Amino acid sequence: MTTTDFDDHERSRWAGRAAAYHGSFAALCAYPAGALLDAAGVEAGVRLVDAGTGPGTVAALACSRGAVVVAVDAEPSMLDLARRHVPAAVSQAALPDLPFTDGCFDAAVANFVINHVGDPAAALTELQRVVRTGGRIAVTIWPYPAPPAQQLWGQIFEAADIERPRTMPKLAADKDFPRTAEGLSCLLRHVGLTDVRCDILTWTHRADPEDWWSGPANGIGTPGLLMERQSPSTIGRIRHQYDRLTVPYRGADGLLALPTAALLASAAVS
């Protein structure tokens, strides 16, 4: 399997955390699922690979459309969760090394996956390899600048006077790309995909405040990495800022209403 230091870091961060993700941020990442499948042309009979399936949200929706689905993920705890939700083949594999023959799928999707790999172009090239000529690939990523829902955690840590770690692995400069509609579109064109389209999806994510807190509190994402390095007293300080800074987002029902956005890009294999 081809990996970079960034890949190794990402996989270590997700190890054993499927339940924590499912109870916190999975609902946020689920929102684009229908649009993602539409962009890839997924309907009854379409042979689809869902790369980085996580808990299987996109794969399960594709199955409900009558697609013939294969779902893969690098993380065993995610696979265990996906197998409970997806009535299709679920196996362990990771971009950019998929165990499939050339052109064996009609479509491929990767929901918030390209932003978690050490070589995004290689990952897209691999998706292109396993999709037949004329098939479509669709991917989502979080944009930069970050939308309010994602900015909120940075504001919380800043208010609590928490410094970001200086040793976190980053993408190599020659592998990175601008997290904008144009940047993502250019990346797809760079690997040889055609008929490239990119839309910005915007929505308001509604979440229970305790669920939204529980993700980082259980090690999910960069906020989770920061949180697990803190003392109990510092965690208390972070929680105080969390409670204070989420007040403007709380509705009458007690839920958070968090404005957010994602980039959805799709392209054809030619």
Model region roles, listed by residue range:
Residues P96-A107:
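A short acidic, Gly/Pro-enriched loop at the edge of an enzyme's catalytic core
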Residues A121, R132, R136-D208, A252:
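Conserved catalytic/acceptor-binding region of the Class I
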Residues R47-L98:
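Class I SAM-dependent methyltransferase SAM/SAH-binding core
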Residues A107-P120, P143:
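A short SAM/SAH-binding and catalytic strip from SAM-dependent methyltransferases
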Residues C29, P55-T57, K175-S270:
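Conserved Class I S-adenosyl-L-methionine
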Residues M1-V46, T57-L61, S77-L81, H85, ...:
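Conserved class I S-adenosyl-L-methionine
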Residues A122-E126:
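Short, conserved SAM-binding segment of the class I
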